[in-house]
Amino acid sequence: MVRSLSRDRSGMSNLAAFAVLILAIALILGVYYVYLVPQAAPEPLRAQERDSVTVEYVGTFENSELVFDTSVITVAQDNASYPKAFSFGWRDRWQPLQFAVGDGSMIRGFDQGVRGLAVGESRTLVVPYADGYGAADPSKISTRRLLESVPVRLTMNATHFLATYRTSAVSGINVTDPVWGWTAVVSVAGSIVTVMNSPVPDQAIRPYNLWDATVVSIDDSANGGVGEILVQHRLDPTMIDRIGGKVDGQDFFLSDVDLIEGSYTLDFNRQVAGRSLLFQVTLKTLLRP
């Protein structure tokens, strides 16, 4: 029996239609997966050894909100939102910090802390002093009384006098004490220079020209004739880390005020030494060699 040619043509037509349908479905699925199904983003580069990076940062002390350093000019300008530590310094240019990870130019805690960051990511770094600027030297820390005793008479040689008062010792001249700001009278006997401090009771003074104080009393014959001036310092804990100055060429800052103990502390170390530091860092660029 001869098969019908028309039926064969129908079967071929159905097969072609089925193939077209499969192709259409494949195209639709392809479009769906390519354009509509979210694709996993490629893993970003993360900072590692030898990468050249730039970061923005704000550095504060762990036990306070005071900013001691930053690369961000808006932070530098805003003292209300970002109060500053004594050691904070203004600079001519404000820009992200650039360095090569692991090149030794950064403190260890900062260098280690930026590793693993991708561009645009931020992180808070807690840097103990051992990974920061090292321990403080205890010999450079001086604790004194808020009601402080100062001698009326000081004796020294001419070299010491010149270094302290920035003038040659001549009997009868008046000098200004570089710490207390009051007048003192000079007398010279051979190689010995005597300086007699001459404030008056209730005199308002500004030690180191930094804070207010008052001369409480003067006993000219106390301590075997050396004499004693009692000075009451007007300090409080809100001033800690905020004020500092220079004496004999050395920088210092107010590191403690203990109203219960009646004491205050001046620290001649770097303000970042011996302290845990916080850095808010954001990775801005990353270049891998």
Predicted regions, residues:
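FKBP-type peptidyl-prolyl cis-trans isomerases
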Residues: V2-P289
